[in-house]
Amino acid sequence: MKAGIIGAMEPEVAILKEKLTDAKSTEHAGYTFHQGQLDGSDVVIVQSGIGKVAAALATAILIDRFQVDYVVNTGSAGGFDASLKVGDIVVSSEVRYHDVDLTAFGYEIGQLPANPAAFMPHDDLVAAAKKGIEQLSQTAGENIKAVTGLITTGDTFMTKEEDVAKARANFPTMAAVEMEGAAIAQACLQLKTPFVVIRSLSDIAGKESPHTFEEYLETAAVNSSQLVLNMLGQLKGKVLSAA
């Protein structure tokens, strides 16, 4: 199988790009797609840029032009689970938009017309991520906690208390918030491609400043990149089950 790996920012994909073998790059529509192998697994890596539109466009090209079999969205996120700390990991059990509201027309909060309220990752990808986390905890030399939970997406970096309070009220089980995952998931659904979103926490939403986000982004990038490598190892030589 060929994996498509998407990160929004350069630090979120830099480690994986450095480890590519048999690498070649292709420019298309303003994106650079890096093809090659990671520990013997065929991959295509792209830095999408920040936000929903950029992420959806990069995903569509990745799937349609490079024919990847599944998509892994890796990177950083703000934590909403009080039991988690910077560097801990959230694997998507579902992904939703937190900045969409068409409830006046009978839709659930976060739901777009002709789409589900929640985008569901592939079970095999979630299972591989969980096994990869076990490996990461054993090799990282620190206690990295991981949960499987709701990840929400919107074009907002949450530092305002009113934004945090609204998100908590609308999505009380939310474990993490970021700016690309649901858009990637929507593109994957449209193009019938399995996905999973994996995020390492770089800050705690509503409590930390952008300065703290930048300070801890490297930690999050290291952990999420290693998890992707572990996950690829778990999936090597396997075929995903029917969704």
UniProtKB/Swiss-Prot annotation:
<dbReference type="InterPro" id="IPR000845">
    <property type="entry name" value="Nucleoside_phosphorylase_d"/>
</dbReference>
<protein>
    <recommendedName>
        <fullName>5'-methylthioadenosine/S-adenosylhomocysteine nucleosidase</fullName>
        <ecNumber>3.2.2.9</ecNumber>
    </recommendedName>
</protein>
<dbReference type="Pfam" id="PF01048">
    <property type="entry name" value="PNP_UDP_1"/>
</dbReference>
<dbReference type="InterPro" id="IPR035994">
    <property type="entry name" value="Nucleoside_phosphorylase_sf"/>
</dbReference>
<dbReference type="GO" id="GO:0019284">
    <property type="term" value="P:L-methionine salvage from S-adenosylmethionine"/>
</dbReference>
<comment type="pathway">
    <text>Amino-acid biosynthesis; L-methionine biosynthesis via salvage pathway; S-methyl-5-thio-alpha-D-ribose 1-phosphate from S-methyl-5'-thioadenosine (hydrolase route): step 1/2.</text>
</comment>
<dbReference type="GO" id="GO:0019509">
    <property type="term" value="P:L-methionine salvage from methylthioadenosine"/>
</dbReference>
<comment type="function">
    <text>Catalyzes the irreversible cleavage of the glycosidic bond in both 5'-methylthioadenosine (MTA) and S-adenosylhomocysteine (SAH/AdoHcy) to adenine and the corresponding thioribose, 5'-methylthioribose and S-ribosylhomocysteine, respectively. Also cleaves 5'-deoxyadenosine, a toxic by-product of radical S-adenosylmethionine (SAM) enzymes, into 5-deoxyribose and adenine.</text>
</comment>
<feature type="binding site">
    <location>
        <position position="158"/>
    </location>
    <ligand>
        <name>substrate</name>
    </ligand>
</feature>
<dbReference type="InterPro" id="IPR010049">
    <property type="entry name" value="MTA_SAH_Nsdase"/>
</dbReference>
<comment type="similarity">
    <text>Belongs to the PNP/UDP phosphorylase family. MtnN subfamily.</text>
</comment>
<feature type="active site" description="Proton acceptor">
    <location>
        <position position="12"/>
    </location>
</feature>
<dbReference type="GO" id="GO:0005829">
    <property type="term" value="C:cytosol"/>
</dbReference>
<keyword id="KW-0378">Hydrolase</keyword>
<dbReference type="GO" id="GO:0009164">
    <property type="term" value="P:nucleoside catabolic process"/>
</dbReference>
<keyword id="KW-0028">Amino-acid biosynthesis</keyword>
<dbReference type="GO" id="GO:0008782">
    <property type="term" value="F:adenosylhomocysteine nucleosidase activity"/>
</dbReference>
<dbReference type="GO" id="GO:0008930">
    <property type="term" value="F:methylthioadenosine nucleosidase activity"/>
</dbReference>
<feature type="active site" description="Proton donor">
    <location>
        <position position="203"/>
    </location>
</feature>
<keyword id="KW-0486">Methionine biosynthesis</keyword>
<feature type="binding site">
    <location>
        <begin position="179"/>
        <end position="180"/>
    </location>
    <ligand>
        <name>substrate</name>
    </ligand>
</feature>
<feature type="binding site">
    <location>
        <position position="78"/>
    </location>
    <ligand>
        <name>substrate</name>
    </ligand>
</feature>
